[in-house]
Curated annotation (Swiss-Prot):
Transmembrane spans: none
Function: Thrombin-like snake venom serine protease that acts as an anticoagulant. It cleaves fibrinogen (FGA) to split off the A-fibrinopeptides (A, AY and AP), but not the B-fibrinopeptide. The resulting fibrin polymers are imperfectly formed and much smaller in size (1 to 2 um long) than the fibrin polymers produced by the action of thrombin. These ancrod-induced microthrombi are friable, unstable, urea-soluble and have significantly degraded alpha chains. They do not cross-link to form thrombi.
Family per record: Belongs to the peptidase S1 family. Snake venom subfamily.
Disulfide bridge map: 7-141, 28-44, 78-232, 120-188, 152-167, 178-203
Tissue/organ expression: Expressed by the venom gland.
Annotated organism of origin: Calloselasma rhodostoma
Location, primary (coarse class): secreted
Entry annotation: catalytic residues: 43, 88, 182
GO CC list: extracellular region; secretory granule
Any one Gene Ontology BP term: proteolysis
Enzyme Commission number, as recorded: 3.4.21.74
Annotated protein name in UniProt: Thrombin-like enzyme ancrod
Glycosylation sites: 23, 79, 99, 148, 229
Length: 234
């Protein structure tokens, strides 16, 4: 996160650190939405993945940190791996549920559509340098605003005129999500309204907001998968 501050240690109990499973390279963020389920971006998918819950600093370990791996992964488009504009979402069923603790608790899905102009909060362990990847040891948090979708249309090549994505950022270019923040939460009104999908290169440019997968638009799919009514798993 560019231009953010270290998150309060108690404000990100739902934030998940996603690692490549073989060499423990940090990949992305994710969000705990249920004791057994995590939501993240599809482009964060790797053959092997490890997920860490209750983490603050990567270099320190809390007593209540928990590690899990995917039991099953669900995508919107069953037999495809290529990411498209508005389907950058993945549900992960954990190998076993996590337990709520001082530093671990799920975040609610949105009950209403997001409102343009809303003050929202983005967080993650991603790059704190807009031009070269310098990952943060602790999660950084920044306040950004939701903008009209048309503001993002045209900023990204081949982007459709409509899509299930949110456009959010600081138009002065001071605060933004960045590389390796992907899959992490965009929180508005204390609900999960978006997950980091993609943004301008370099990050945090004036009048160039980033794109977030709109969770409200996938709410039914998420609930159906969790209820066992969907079979879209590779």
């Amino acid at each position: 996160v560019i231009g953010g501050d270290e998150c309060n240690i108690n404000e990100h109990r739902f934030l998940v650190a996603v690692y490549e499973g073989t060499n423990w390279t940090f990949i992305c963020g994710g969000v705990l939405i249920h004791p057994e389920w995590v939501i993240t971006a599809e482009h964060c998918a790797r053959r092997r993945m490890n997920l860490v819950f209750g983490m603050h600093r990567k270099s320190e370990k809390f007593d209540d940190e928990q590690e899990r791996y995917p039991k099953k992964r669900y995508f919107i488009r069953c037999n495809k791996t290529r990411t498209s504009w508005d389907e950058d979402i993945m549900l992960i069923r954990l190998n076993k549920p996590v337990n709520n603790s001082e530093h671990i608790a799920p975040l609610s899905l949105p009950s209403n559509p997001p409102i343009v102009g809303s003050d929202c909060r983005v967080m993650g362990w991603g790059s704190i340098n807009r031009r070269i990847d310098v990952l943060s040891d602790e999660p950084r948090c920044a306040n950004i605003n939701l903008h009209n979708f048309t503001m993002c249309h045209g900023l990204f090549r081949k982007m459709p005129k409509k899509g299930r994505v949110l456009c959010a950022g600081d138009l002065r270019g001071r605060r933004d999500s960045c590389n390796s923040d992907s899959g992490g939460p965009l929180i508005c009104n204390e609900e999960l309204h978006g997950i980091v999908a993609r943004g301008p290169n370099p990050c945090a440019q004036p009048n160039k907001p980033a794109l977030y997968t709109s969770i409200y638009d996938y709410r039914d799919w998420v609930n159906n998968v969790i209820a066992g009514n969907a079979t879209c798993s590779p």
